[in-house]
Amino acid sequence: WQTVVDMGWPAAAIAEEYGGLGLGYLELCVLAEEFGAALIPVPFVSSVLQATEAIKLANDEQQSAEWLPGLASGVTIATLAFAEGLAGRSWSDRPLARGGNGRLHGCKTPVADGLAADVAVVSAVSAEDGEGFGWWLVPLEQAGVTRQAEDAVDRVRKHATLQFDGAEAIRLGRPGAGREMAARLMDIAAVLT
């Protein structure tokens, strides 16, 4: 990971004002292609292509200023936690995890790079979301978060189950916009991977 960070790759598509290189999706796509070709076992997909993009999509100046510099420098590793380990569920289904009052409850599995990540972007439902759902930023080094390694078909990236029991959580983006953000993230992932 340090070699990847030294080359500036986590900063590729982050704006210069947040410590990034200010490049676009074309450059990010080239990097993603090289990672895929070499099967490099680092959290590039989960941290750079998924979680960082989710934070950027939320378009919140304060959250961008707080999280993007650490992600650009590679000091902070993030992951996207939306799967709930239930057969037949889609990324666009309402999550079972519950958020509200700055706390999160529920379970996400499998979570790529869930053991290496410092923070997770988690899909969850709260009273404010109406019929939709939202996204939450959850620092993973805290009481209320339990991580357990999981066996997965993907042998390149380690997967985990993340259990949230009243974990401190910060809303990412506007309430009820989870499905819209998820659809955009899936579009981005389809292009970049």
Model-derived segments and spans:
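A short, Trp-centered hydrophobic/proline-enriched beta-strand micro-motif
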Residues: 74-85
